[in-house]
Swiss-Prot record:
SMART domains: CNX, Connexin_CCC. Residues 318-358 are annotated as: Disordered. The chain crosses the membrane at residues 20-40, 77-97, 165-185, 206-226. Belongs to the connexin family. Alpha-type (group II) subfamily. Pfam families: Connexin (PF00029), Connexin40_C (PF16791). This is Gap junction alpha-5 protein. Gene3D superfamilies: Gap junction channel protein cysteine-rich domain (1.20.1440.80). Residues 41-76, 186-205 are extracellular. It comes from Canis lupus familiaris.
Length: 358
């Protein structure tokens, strides 16, 4: 059937730069398709036309009936299927090898320029340049595709998936699923319907079902690989978008600074600084006691007659020592009233205790 070594060497290179599912697909292609097709299936269809017997002596009728029964041999059809399905992978391999060569040349040029700039010595590429130049990375021993190489790889999977579906549908339309033992031919130049018999139909049916199952498995692996690459790409985008949103929600350096608000004009009348820098309620027992004392003195003064020649009473308050918040001093007249030396009793018609003590 030919030498498969050339195709095998190329597919081995593809195997090095593929994902895990892609490596499984290549294993299925090597073992279950190329190996089985080259060893067992070819021997079953080797005597296909010679053992195709028809019950007629009409010249040319047997060839016409064989062409009607088998428009293309199963072996040749499967060989074409393998070639067309493997071609996208070969294109991807060519692109990968070209990319590797270009990267090596670029690194050599950069190294030569660095040596010329520094005079001598080895040059090591920074990590950023390596990531920028390479089209894949090795993470934990696995190759992570990225960039244009990833796009080429996805396109190769799409093309081989389309080819796989086309060849499966074509085989079903040409032959169906199983071969019949008896084939009735009604083509010219056969004078009447001619019965033709297929050799070893059961063995051929086994190989046909096996190759269809392998094709379905390869199609499933291709779809699984597309799903794997697409899901991983979407997950990376979601992770990047989540990180971007988290960075946007982080407070800036000036967000934690609390701005001091300007208090209202009468704020100091409501709050006073107590001992230790704490605020306490100004309406304490001290303030209440002082207010009661003032009210009592005012009532006593208002109960007396006014002094002639004076329109109002002059009241003088003296500073009192601070009384603790919990203590309430007794009700007594302020010092201003006790030390007042004016003779209010002479101007009043009422008798007072001061008038009797001369």
């Amino acid at each position: 059937m030919g030498d498969w070594s050339f195709l095998g060497e190329f597919l081995e290179e593809v195997h090095k730069h593929s994902t895990v599912i892609g490596k499984v697909w290549l294993t299925v292609l090597f073992i279950f398709r190329m190996l089985v097709l080259g060893t067992a299936a070819e021997s079953s269809w080797g005597d296909e036309q010679a053992d195709f017997q028809c019950d007629t002596m009409q010249p040319g009728c047997g060839n016409v009936c064989y062409d009607q029964a088998f428009p293309i041999s199963h072996i040749r059809y499967w060989v074409l299927q393998i070639i067309f399905v493997s071609t996208p992978s070969l294109v991807y391999m060519g692109h990968a090898m070209h990319t590797v060569r270009m990267q090596e040349k670029r690194k050599l040029r950069e190294a030569e320029r660095a040596k010329e700039a520094r005079g001598a010595g080895s040059y090591e590429y920074p990590v950023a340049e390596k990531a920028e130049l390479s089209c894949w990375e090795e993470v934990n021993g696995r190759i992570v595709l990225q960039g244009t190489l990833l796009n080429t790889y996805v396109c190769s999977i799409l093309i081989r998936t389309t080819m796989e579906v086309a060849f499966i549908v074509g085989q079903y339309l040409l032959y169906g699923i199983f071969l019949d033992t008896l084939h009735v031919c009604r083509r010219s130049p056969c004078p009447h319907p001619v019965n033709c018999y297929v050799s070893r139909p059961t063995e051929k049916n086994v190989f046909i079902v096996f190759m269809l199952a392998v094709a379905a498995l390869s199609l499933f692996l291709s779809l699984a690989e597309l799903y794997h690459l697409g899901w991983k790409k979407l997950r990376q985008r979601f992770v990047k978008s989540g990180q971007g949103m988290a960075e946007c929600q982080l407070p800036g350096p000036s967000a934690g600074i609390v701005q001091n608000c300007t208090p209202p004009p009468d704020f100091n009348q409501c709050l006073e600084n107590g001992p230790g820098g704490k605020f306490f309620n100004p309406f304490s027992n001290k303030m209440a006691s002082q207010q009661n004392t003032d009210n009592l003195a005012t009532e006593q003064v208002q109960g007396q007659e006014p002094i002639p020649g004076e329109g109002f009473i002059h009241i003088r308050y003296a500073q009192k020592p601070e009384v603790p918040n919990g203590a309430s001093p007794g009700h007594r007249l302020p010092h201003g009233y006790q030390s007042d030396k004016r003779r209010l009793s002479k101007a009043s018609s009422k008798a007072r205790s001061d008038d009797l003590s001369v």
